[in-house]
Every structure is written in C-alpha cells, then in structure tokens.
Regions:
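Alpha/beta catalytic barrel-like cores
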Residues: 1-136, 276, 307-311
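N-proximal accessory regions
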Residues: 3-4, 8-17, 22, 41-45, ...
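Glycine-rich beta-alpha junction loops
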Residues: 58-59, 254-255, 284
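Short active-site-adjacent structural elements
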Residues: 63-65, 257-260, 286-289
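Alpha/beta enzyme core
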Residues: 69-91, 95, 103, 108-110, ...
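Short glycine-centered, acidic/aromatic-flanked micro-motifs in structured strand/loop junctions
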Residues: 157, 252-253, 282
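Short acidic/histidine-rich active-site segments
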Residues: 278-285
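C-terminal helical cap(s) of enzyme catalytic domains, especially alpha/beta-barrels
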Residues: 285-311
Length: 311
C-alpha cells in the first residue's frame, strides 16, 4: 500500500478500523512518510499583517491527555485525527504544531497540503517528574524537521528560580534555537516563569511573570533573527507585547474556562501590534459543544486574514 492508494473514511465514522491503513503503511512502507513530506505543497510563508492560525496537537506526547474533567480526552488517537482533519480542512487554518507521531500520520493522510509545519522538540518534562523543569529534547530535531520541509520547531521553556534544573533547560533551548537558525527555520519558544514547589510544576500567569519570561527567552541562542514567542493571554497583554519585537503567537493554554470565554480573551489580544496569530489545540479540538468545525471557524474569524486589513 502507498499513500497514493490510501483511502480513509470521513471524520465521524466510528469504525475502529478507519485508520488501519496508516498502521499498514508504517509497517510495510515507512519511507512513505518522507515521500509524502517531500511531495506536499508548502505554505507560501508568514507575512506581516496576515495573522497565522496554527492547530496544536503535541499534548499527548507529554502525557497530557486531559481536557477539563475528561482525563482521557486525547487518549483516542483515531478521535484526535478525526478532529485534526476537520480543523485542517478549514482554509483559514494555516498549519499544525505536532509531535513526530501525529505529524507523520497527518503527512500520510495528506492533510497538510499548503500548511505550515511546526514540530514539537522537547516533550521529556513529564508532569510530576522530580526533574520536570529539565525538559529534555525527546521529539523533533532541527535536522529531522529540515528533512521533512517543516517551517520550524517549538520548545517549551519553563524558568523556575527554585529549581536547579533551570540552567540546563535554558541552555538546551538556546542550542535548539541555534540549530534551527542554522537551517533557516523558525524557533518558536514558549516561555513560562514557573515554580517547582510541591508535587508538580506550576506556571505563574501574572502579567509581570510573563513579561520576565519574555525578557529571558528572547535572548536565548546566538541569533534571534528567526525566533518567535508563543505566549499565554494574560491581563494587560499590551504590556506583555511591549516587551518584545519578536513575532508572537498566542497559545490557548489549559482549557479550564468555557470555549466562548477563551475566544473572547483572544479577541482583544489579537489586535495588539506584534501578534502574528494563534497556536491553539485542546480548546478548539475539544470544544464544549463538540462542534470542532464551528469552534475553528469562530476562532478563524478573529484573525486578520489579508495584508490589506488594518487593526
């Protein structure tokens, strides 16, 4: 079987065998992933004035499967792929941020034509580990991302002044920024000021903490020319955006609020200078009413889609 002969049912089919063809290709023809990557049509590239909409799907690789009260929401890979296919079918969605396993599935399916591709690079800081802050780069490498024609790599960078592992985490991010820059790819850095007290790492989501995390993260690496920030939406986002000249995408975060509340919080932040778009996953893939297409459509309507539009 080849990707050319791959036929899949439409999302919504509940057959447990609906993605069996992916397993067969991975077994019999693993090189099909690279062929699919090289054959696909790339995205024309980000431009100033046109905000980008990227769907994030790298949470399972960190063992983060919960969405609100459903602790195993993202555990079903078939359901996740269904939801991603629905989201990526919207022409206003520019691309995806995913771990290698998910990205390879989407390449085989052919769901990434004309899309931006960002790989998730560090997934080793599993929740609850004693050295969670030392978030090892266990996912995509810059070399592997270049091989599949990706646009960049993303790294979570948690800065905990109460953890001895913070220096190693900062150094690892800096080396990844350098490696991506050498290959002319975007380094999407997602910084948080965090605390390692207690059983789990907690991100500090005050305006001042986010500003400090930006100040530290944007200076990582020998070159910043291709570095982007990926930041949470907090109060006084205008102060946060005043802290950087780097292109910035807003993250969805832990979907603890309602889908409507999340959308409203993004609306005003997207109007700020320097905000290049949204990189959101669980809030839109697992909306309150279950309607992925509608949630994605509503989020897309918040973005500036042409370079002629003004804010």
């Amino acid at each position: 079987m080849t990707t050319e002969s791959l036929t899949l049912s439409e999302p919504g089919d509940d057959s447990p065998a609906r993605y069996e063809a992916l397993t067969r290709i991975r077994l019999e023809d693993p090189d099909a992933v690279l062929r699919a990557a090289r054959a696909r049509r790339p995205h024309p590239g980000p431009v100033c004035g046109r905000q980008n909409f990227i769907i994030a799907a790298d949470h399972p690789a960190r063992g983060a499967l919960a969405v609100k009260d459903d602790v195993h929401a993202m555990a079903d890979r078939r359901s996740l792929l269904d939801r991603l296919r629905i989201a990526l079918a919207n022409p206003m969605v520019d691309g995806v941020l995913a771990s290698p396993d998910v990205l390879d599935d989407l390449l085989l399916i052919g769901a990434l034509e004309g899309k931006l591709l960002f790989g998730s690079m560090n997934r080793g800081g599993l929740p609850g580990l004693v050295n969670e802050i030392d978030d090892r780069f266990t996912g995509h490498t810059a070399e592997a991302l270049a091989e599949i024609g990706a646009d960049g790599g993303k790294m979570l960078t948690r800065i905990a002044f109460d953890s001895e592992h913070t220096t190693a985490a900062l150094e690892a991010t800096a080396r990844a920024v350098d490696s991506l820059h050498e290959r002319r790819m975007i380094a999407m850095v997602e910084p948080f000021l965090s605390t390692a007290r207690g059983e789990r790492v907690t991100n500090v989501l005050t305006t001042e903490a986010v500003i400090q995390s930006v100040a530290i993260a944007q200076g990582l690496g020998a070159r910043s020319a291709r570095t982007w920030m990926k930041l949470p939406v907090v109060e006084e986002m205008e102060r946060v955006m005043a802290a950087t000249t780097l292109p910035t995408v807003l993250l969805g975060g832990d979907p603890s609020s309602s889908t409507d509340e999340a959308l409203e919080s993004w609306r005003s932040a997207l109007r700020l200078p320097g905000v290049q778009g949204l990189t959101v996953g669980r809030t839109l893939l697992y909306p309150d009413d279950g309607d992925v297409a509608s949630a994605v459509e509503t989020a897309a309507s918040l973005l500036t889609h042409t370079t002629q539009e003004t804010r």
